């Protein structure tokens, strides 16, 4: 569906290309240059952004468009950091922002520099209109891909105080998500004792112990939460490390686990099931030593589909994009909604340009028209949610 844009197409494409060309890779966490670029873009448009250091090399940038205070604020949120480009070859180099056949390629083009740039442009479009009843806040945060330190800093700095709703511009292909699974990352470690590979009976093989432990972990029921619409718990075994060579009995083995928990299943329930798996494995292989190290935890969050922000998003998807859809409850990926919207609960919607299945892959891209349409969607959403100020 064609949309009459309220901004210059060339400027929008330039902004996104400039942003993708900055390698804000996390790890190691080097996104301050991206935050500084966004701050300059906001200053160029007449705003007074705040740049906040989160850690060396990491920073948030925020800006606020003041309303009259008659209504709660709306928070636009996105993250600056991107995952590493990986070892697989790219046809389009990851930090050159090449444009081909209506697509802009690069690491972060979908996840989520297109959503972030679209929110900045929408912020500017709204500012050029009349005064609104509530504040519009733009927030670009650090460290979403690892630990959510940037979003946590927004909360600790009280930027979410007085916010009535949050819009997170992750790549969803304009599907509207209203819930997010919790995230529980664990590292399991089995500790044995080393020996020469020709005399394995003189040692204890930590990899063999881990094999028995993983069999019990994989038997943990992947449960639904109280509302089946949010799906089941999922488990991914992400990494396994152990041993130094075929002629040495390994004395250490480490495995990383990624559990995603639907709303209503607390971390502690899962942890007890993991501890039970350890006990079962130990009963089969007496003397097994296991250490459990939680590494990352994010709570599950959900917004009622009847909430005003959800209904406005769905209405605008119909009007602007010709998409008739209901809200989708839970994406497969994690976002900063768990940090921003859990305590206290704040309604949120996750919606943005770009396809989620392209995130973290070689030759990631965004359709330029989708990116441009997102600007108009976000701008109109802000105008309708906040509403025009009451005349004096």
What are these regions (language model features)?
Residues 1-2, 7, 53, 178, ...:
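Metal-dependent amide/peptide-bond hydrolase catalytic core
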Residues 2-107, 128-132, 345, 355:
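Acidic/His- and Gly-rich active-site-bordering loop/insert found
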Residues 19, 23, 170, 210, ...:
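Residue-level signal for inorganic ion chemistry
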Residues 45, 128-132, 159-161, 280-287, ...:
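Short helix-capping segments at alpha-helix termini
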Residues 55-60, 172-173, 333-334:
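Short acidic loop-to-helix transition motifs that present clustered carboxylates
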Residues 101-104, 109-110, 114-219, 360-373:
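Fold-level recognition of mixed alpha/beta catalytic cores in primary-metabolism enzymes, strongest
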């Amino acid at each position: 569906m064609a949309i009459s844009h309220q901004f210059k197409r060339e400027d929008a494409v330039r902004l996104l290309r400039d942003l993708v060309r900055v390698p804000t890779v996390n790890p190691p966490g080097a996104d301050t240059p991206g935050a500084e670029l966004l701050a300059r873009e906001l200053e160029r448009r007449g705003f007074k952004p705040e740049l906040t250091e989160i850690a060396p090399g990491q920073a948030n940038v925020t800006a606020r468009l003041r309303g009259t205070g008659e209504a709660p604020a709306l928070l636009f949120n996105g993250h600056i950091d991107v995952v590493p480009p990986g070892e697989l070859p790219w046809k389009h180099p990851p930090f050159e922002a090449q444009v081909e056949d209506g697509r802009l390629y690069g690491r972060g083009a979908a996840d989520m520099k297109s959503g972030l740039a679209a929110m900045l442009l929408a912020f500017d479009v709204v500012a050029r209109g009349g005064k609104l009843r509530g504040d519009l806040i733009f927030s670009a945060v650090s460290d979403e891909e690892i630990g959510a330190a940037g979003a946590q800093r927004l909360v600790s700095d009280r930027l979410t105080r007085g916010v009535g709703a949050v819009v997170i511009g992750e790549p969803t292909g304009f599907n509207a998500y209203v819930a997010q699974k919790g995230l529980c990352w664990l590292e399991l470690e089995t500790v044995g004792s080393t020996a020469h590979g020709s005399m394995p009976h003189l040692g204890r093989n930590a990899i063999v112990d881990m094999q028995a432990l993983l069999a019990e972990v994989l038997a943990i029921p992947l449960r639904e939460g109280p509302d089946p619409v949010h799906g089941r718990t999922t488990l991914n075994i992400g990494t396994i490390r152990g041993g130094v060579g075929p002629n040495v009995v390994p004395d250490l083995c480490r495995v990383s686990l990624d559990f995603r928990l639907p709303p209503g299943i607390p971390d502690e329930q899962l942890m007890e099931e993991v501890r039970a798996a350890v006990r079962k494995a130990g009963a089969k292989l007496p003397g097994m030593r296991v250490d459990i190290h939680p590494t990352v935890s994010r709570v599950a969050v959900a917004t009622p589909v009847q909430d005003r922000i959800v209904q406005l998003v769905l209405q605008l998807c119909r009007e602007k994009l010709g998409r008739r859809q209901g809200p989708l409850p839970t994406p497969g990926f994690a976002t900063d909604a768990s940090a921003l919207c859990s305590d206290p609960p704040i309604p949120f919607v996750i919606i943005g340009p770009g396809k989620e299945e392209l995130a973290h892959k070689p030759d990631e891209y965004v359709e330029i028209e989708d990116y441009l349409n997102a600007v108009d969607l976000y701008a109109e959403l802000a105008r309708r949610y906040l509403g025009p100020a009451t005349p004096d």
